[in-house]
Amino acid sequence: YGVGPVQGGLYTFTAAAPVAAGLSLFGGGESNASHTAYESGMSAWCGNCHGAFHNNNTQLIHKSGTALGGAYSQIYNLYNGTDDPTGGVQATSYLAAVPFEDAANTTTSTAGPAASSQVSCISCHRAHATSAPDAGRWDFAVTLLAEDGLESGSYVIPDPYASVNQRSLCNKCHNKD
């Protein structure tokens, strides 16, 4: 898959397929030490069907396909949950629930992002299906992850920090706890 006509010529993709390494179907569930390794191109790939959804709409404020930069990568790396918002370390800060793109990613990477790593559509959303509204990796409308699924009626998405106090995973990059 890549650039060119798809679905028998009904659509034309202008962005090539992303570079990523996936897990074996028989390897168990995703974890912080065993996960899809997103390397590059996810936002452009999503844009084949969804356009530059967040980049060209004034009602949506989250960029994608751009470098995190030093400030956001530092917040990501330090954030270790609501109960420990600055106790993380870069070497073990990867959170499978909030992935990022980096050419150095592997399926067993545990390191958090560098300033040059990219935020992508898949940092907050899953492709085409989740139990959360808006194909979110979590329910964006709740304050506490313990409320996930209650308001929307969706399947409760597990809290990666296992804390009754854990706030939205937006805090992994935007720490407002």
Regions found by a protein language model. Name each.
Residues 1-177:
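A motif-centric signal for short, conserved binding hotspots located
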